[in-house]
Amino acid sequence: MWFKNLLVYRLTQDVPFDAEALETALATKPARACASQEVATYGFVAPFGKGEDAPLVHISQDFLLIAARKEERILPGSVVRDALKEKVDEIEAEQMRKVYKKERDQLKDEIIQAFLPRAFIRRSATFAAIAPKQGLILVNASSPKRAEDLLSTLREVIGSLPVRPLTVKVSPSATMTDWVKTQKAADNFFVLDECELRDTHEDGGIVRCKRQDLTSDEIQLHLNTGKVVTQLSLAWQDKLSFVLDDKLVVKRLKFEDLLQDQAEQDGGDEALGQLDASFTLMMLTFGEFLPELFDALGGEEIPQGI
């Protein structure tokens, strides 16, 4: 269980996350299949294991792991548009009259309802780790919308969830730009070979570099003409690499072989043991990595009134 992306949320009040109570709460909204006329469903699933007896909360040391699954019927817009056009053309030809917006919208709804039972189904799972002692919730997602879906559903079942996206005092873009300009990152961080540069003007250009020497004159020229770094590939110690963006989203996390080998050794022969060991080691690594990342970005910003 290694997260590939990371969105970090700060609990703004102490929340007594009791594993047994949380298990009971999550069980009130289990994931389920879409009914024939449902567009989507959302609910909680066991993060590890299958079957009705698999727990919805996985506990390891002081960390809790939960997962939610979305099931949605996929109706391509082009299919609906083509069917609607065909129906409208048929009515206008047969009845010699114009089909206006209100009727067109009603026809569209009828077409969607007729197509839904035959639509393809897509399932996607989102994992979140709760670290009560650190006051953090870490979501394995690069999309804030996907993370908010999980957090709002968690809030729904437990009654209250005072949480906000973690922010830092210095703009990530300003820090990353400085690191590339000076060719030196903060202690324990190393600039790799990928970045995105954007002009600060609204309609300005974008330059994306991969497998590029970011110390080159070409990159420095872009920075000297006013572009800023909005994404940057980095490594931390010898433990992980990632891409950081200007919204403080950590993407394309890759844990180095050293950690993965250690988890494999700690986990034993059982699949569940392997998953538990990798989750625990990941969270302990985050416990070192995240404070250093936030410090490198000027420290955590605490909004007034919180």
Swiss-Prot record:
Its main location: cytoplasm. Keywords: Cytoplasm, DNA recombination. GO terms for cellular component: bacterial nucleoid; cytoplasm. One of its GO terms (biological process) is regulation of DNA recombination. InterPro entries: RdgC. It is found in: Cytoplasm, Nucleoid. One of its GO terms (molecular function) is double-stranded DNA binding. HAMAP family: RdgC. Belongs to the RdgC family. May be involved in recombination. NCBIfam families: PRK00321.1-2, PRK00321.1-3, PRK00321.1-5. PANTHER family: RECOMBINATION-ASSOCIATED PROTEIN RDGC (PTHR38103:SF1). This is Recombination-associated protein RdgC. It comes from Pseudomonas savastanoi pv. phaseolicola (strain 1448A / Race 6).
